């Protein structure tokens, strides 16, 4: 019997995994969630001997039950190959009393590669399974990392086109250069004069525009999403938490069944939600530590039970977390209100109309497995400097937010469980912020000179993703206002 996916906003909308991957977003703006969380089938003695690819199969087959073994193994083989610069795919590095799970060894040096290298293969396979003849148009909003990882994943993939919107002044110079130099005739990159939340709202609006959908269909196109709202992004992310636990076991850092904490720098809530799903599958997890930057809407939510986006949007040195509407949180809300779509819709309606909602005491009780805290800009910079001076290990700004929050958590609770920190981007992606945190003397250096300095300092070679863009020509220079997004998509598609 296939595991089905249901919309968080409509109990009657049930689809298979492949249909959920193709649709991306459910009708009425809902998100697809599995009707139940499957339990891990293998024991840890087996899992600890497995490669990343083998672990991926064992986890993903439980969620993508309408894929054949051959289909799923092919997707995995095509995703986790030499695009990653280490055979381990996601190595663990011990520093500062924790284990950093390095999720940045893929082609765009950010954790998004872990899911976005497999999503195109899942999507093309899903299209074949469902006899889809239309060309699939991936529509994505990015706060910096998703965009490039999605572009790299879909560039040149037959039967697809991809359009990425990013906030023109809301990403790092290296993030922007990575996107606007992207090769591939099926790619389009557009800078909007607005912030990430506006880009994400614009994309969601296009998804739910019935008239646009009809025009697209008539021209032989249909939309899907590469954002973390797509279940095809979420499922591959569960894998690396299972893999990390198995590796800790193999190294003798933990005993079988021993609980670990997982600490995740959080913006759109997808990465920590994957850890929550892993815990519900039977992964022994104590606390899920949700780390925010100055845009601390999630910290306030865990503290008070009130989600309130009515606040200033702050641009920080950890831009992938500069988010006030945390999309994937809806999947957790749906779960803690007893999988009740009506209750969830009411809360989401309040968010849309008033910019806030409050959960019940009973729902808040269901969040006791989470701990939320945040780091200011100063604390983030101080954490980068401290860990470099203490361990010779250089982390990026997002990872530093998580490491800083972990430091607060330990001091507050005295909890000394083994902790895995999701290291979500290479420091080379945020070179200026990282280097000036270590020493202000770097403030006036040119971007690529800083890259070489960081390489010498960290004793790590410059990643290919950075070398490639040093001299790459700009291929995309389109900009638009927030209300001009749909017109740009139509122009690219020739509708």
Predicted feature descriptions by range:
Residues 1-495:
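PLP-dependent amino-acid enzyme catalytic core
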């Amino acid at each position: 019997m296939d595991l089905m996916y249901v919309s968080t906003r409509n109990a009657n909308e049930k689809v298979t995994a492949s249909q959920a991957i193709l649709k991306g977003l459910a009708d009425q703006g809902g998100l697809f969630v599995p009707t139940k969380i499957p339990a891990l089938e293998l024991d840890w003695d087996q899992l600890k001997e497995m490669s990343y690819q083998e672990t991926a199969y064992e986890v993903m087959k439980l969620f993508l039950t309408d894929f054949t073994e051959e289909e799923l193994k092919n997707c995995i083989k095509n995703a986790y190959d030499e695009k990653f610069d280490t055979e381990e795919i996601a190595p663990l590095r011990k520093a500062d009393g924790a284990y950093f799970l390095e999720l940045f060894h893929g082609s765009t040096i950010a954790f998004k590669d872990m899911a976005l290298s497999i999503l195109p293969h899942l999507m093309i396979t899903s299209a074949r399974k469902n006899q889809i003849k239309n060309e699939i148009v991936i529509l994505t909003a990015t706060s910096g990392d998703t965009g490039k990882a999605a572009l790299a994943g879909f560039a040149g993939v037959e039967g697809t086109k991809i359009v990425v919107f990013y906030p023109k002044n809301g990403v790092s110079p290296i993030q922007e250069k990575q996107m606007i130099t992207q090769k591939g005739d099926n790619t389009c990159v557009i800078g909007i004069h607005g912030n990430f939340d506006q880009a994400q709202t614009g994309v969601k609006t296009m998804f739910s525009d019935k008239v646009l959908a009809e025009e697209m269909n008539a021209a032989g196109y249909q939309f899907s999403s590469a954002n973390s709202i797509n279940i095809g992004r979420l499922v591959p992310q569960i894998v690396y938490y299972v893999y990390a636990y198995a590796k800790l076991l193999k190294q003798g850092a933990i005993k079988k069944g021993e609980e670990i904490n997982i600490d995740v720098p959080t913006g759109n809530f997808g990465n920590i939600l994957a850890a929550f799903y892993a815990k519900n599958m039977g992964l022994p997890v104590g606390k899920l530590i949700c780390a925010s930057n100055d845009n601390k809407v999630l910290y306030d939510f865990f503290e008070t039970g009130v989600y309130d986006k009515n606040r200033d949007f702050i641009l920080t040195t950890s831009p992938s977390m500069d988010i006030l509407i945390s999309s994937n949180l809806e999947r957790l809300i749906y779960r803690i209100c007893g999988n009740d779509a009506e209750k969830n819709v009411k809360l989401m309606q309040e968010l849309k109309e008033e910019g806030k909602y409050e959960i019940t005491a009973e729902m808040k009780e269901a969040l006791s497995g989470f701990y939320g805290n945040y780091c200011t800009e100063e604390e983030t910079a101080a954490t980068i400097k401290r860990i470099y001076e203490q361990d010779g290990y250089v982390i990026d700004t997002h990872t530093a937010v998580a490491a800083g929050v972990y430091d607060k958590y330990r001091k507050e609770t005295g909890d000394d469980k083994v902790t895995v920190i999701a290291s979500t981007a290479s420091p080379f992606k945020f070179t200026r912020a990282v280097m000036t945190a270590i020493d202000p003397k770097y403030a006036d250096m040119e971007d690529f000179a800083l890259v070489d300095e960081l390489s010498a300092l960290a004793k790590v070679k410059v990643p290919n993703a950075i070398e490639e863009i040093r001299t790459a020509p700009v291929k995309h220079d389109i900009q638009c206002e927030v209300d001009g997004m749909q017109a740009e998509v139509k122009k690219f598609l020739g509708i």
